[in-house]
A protein has these predicted regions:
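Ubiquitin-like/PB1-type beta-grasp interaction modules and other compact soluble beta-rich domains
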Residues: 1-91
Length: 92
């Protein structure tokens, strides 16, 4: 099934603005992120901790609705879903 991935800020520099990913039925948010990390070591280094878990500061949205990166990674994805990936936001 096809899902769209949109990347922002430093993740955009690594992955590009957006990409369509063909993933197996039943894939979860985490399995998609790991798939992206497998093909992009720079993304994996930025998004995942040394122990392999997603860094808690990574912001995720599915279909423009924010999800909790610590508790919602097992959400199954559906055909046509859009996953947005944001790095931490800082400012002053």
């Amino acid at each position: 099934m096809l899902v769209k991935v949109r990347a922002f800020a430093q993740f955009r520099e690594i992955l590009g603005k957006e990409m369509d990913m063909n993933i197996p039925e039943g894939s979860t948010v985490l399995s998609l992120l790991k798939s992206i990390g497998a093909s992009s070591p720079a993304f994996r280094e930025q998004a995942f901790s040394g122990s392999g878990g997603l860094n808690d500061y990574v912001l995720l949205m599915i279909n423009k609705k924010r999800i909790d990166p610590l508790n919602d990674l097992s959400i199954p994805l559906n055909e046509g879903d859009e996953l947005a990936i944001f790095p931490p936001v800082a400012g002053g």
